């Protein structure tokens, strides 16, 4: 079948379709599988979503897990309650992940993680790594909050907060706050570093500028 266009599709259970597929709205209560590319305005899947190709959408909400073989571009919200496995890059207005996400790179305005991310990098204006979450990769953001007990490989940001008992290998920031019990191996700051007396920072060095230029409005 060639390029199939669907106005609205509602499935209570599971469905498998051949792509490339274009649709306005797809809602599947169980699992949804497309052999090929999918372009859709609204995609809602209660269980498992699998796209063997590229995914382009206005909004994606998945209660369970999503797997794509290639890249994902979402204009507004990309929200996953369980796990997301993206074969290429993920670009979205807002990314919210409750469980785990794996992708090459993530580009968004807002990135909120409540679990684990295995990625090369995240670039977002606003980044929130929730309590006890883990990021295996680099985080670039205008404002970055590493929540209590979270673990992150590296952060480069304008305004960075490392909350209580969080661990970050390397931080570069214009302004940074490191709370009680937090651990940072290497800290580089341009303007200001507030380090709690009970935080563990192996080395803190004032530098002239960040190693990467971030596009942010002045704080």
Give the positions of each predicted feature:
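Intrinsically disordered, low-complexity terminal regions
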Residues: 1-219
């Amino acid at each position: 079948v060639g390029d199939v266009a669907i106005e609205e599709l509602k499935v209570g259970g599971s469905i498998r379709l051949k792509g490339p597929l274009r649709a306005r709205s797809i809602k599947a209560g169980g699992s949804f599988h497309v052999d090929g590319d999918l372009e859709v305005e609204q995609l809602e899947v209660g269980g498992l979503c699998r796209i063997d190709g590229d995914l382009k959408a206005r909004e994606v909400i998945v209660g369970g897990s999503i797997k794509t073989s290639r890249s994902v571009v979402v204009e507004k919200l990309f929200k996953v309650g369980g796990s997301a496995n993206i074969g290429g890059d993920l670009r979205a207005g807002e990314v919210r992940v409750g469980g785990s996400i794996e992708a090459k790179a993530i580009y968004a305005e807002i990135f909120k993680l409540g679990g684990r991310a295995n990625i090369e990098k995240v670039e977002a204006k606003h980044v929130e790594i929730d309590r006890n979450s883990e990021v295996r990769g680099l985080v670039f953001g205008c404002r970055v909050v590493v929540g209590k007990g979270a673990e992150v490989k590296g952060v480069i940001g304008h305004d960075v907060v490392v909350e209580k008992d969080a661990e970050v290998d390397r931080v570069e920031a214009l302004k940074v706050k490191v709370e009680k019990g937090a651990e940072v191996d290497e800290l580089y700051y341009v303007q200001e570093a507030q380090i709690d007396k009970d935080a563990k920072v192996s080395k803190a060095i004032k530098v002239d500028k960040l190693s990467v230029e971030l596009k942010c409005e002045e704080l």
